[in-house]
């Protein structure tokens, strides 16, 4: 798979200042990878070997199924199923252990071609992010201007920065991440609480003021899970 597909300028991800920028990065990498394998790449032998070996998780199967080219998905499924027939569910070999097939199935169940490419792309782009944070004041300002960081990506950035960022800037970066997450958490909690209060009979009626609470359930789930 061409590395250029998984290369995105960091500033392009952070310029919109809407939602979690790391979710935006993940979504962009997912979209590019799915479009790539649902196109002509599905006929490339090296790509087919990888998709046969790794398969796909439910989330990315659904994204692929939503694409218009169902034949591409069917051909990948055909090849993947045939590969499992050949390499997993074959006649038991003489010295094969009792759980050998189960271990192979477990490997397939816990792997995903798209996830592996997204993780690969994100790990490299985030290292670039850390370098930019250290070297460019403008980017530090841009980072601080983001709307929020979701909880899982706060965890990811803070854990990665302790390994991949200049120690001199780690505290400043961790504090910036905490500010983006806690500030949005306060707003979100207030919106969810307001939503709950609107079911009190005293707050009903044609002129009931829901404020920003109507989509607070969906926003809370996305904040907690990235999805």
Predicted feature locations:
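Intrinsically disordered, low-complexity regulatory regions of eukaryotic proteins
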Residues: 1-227
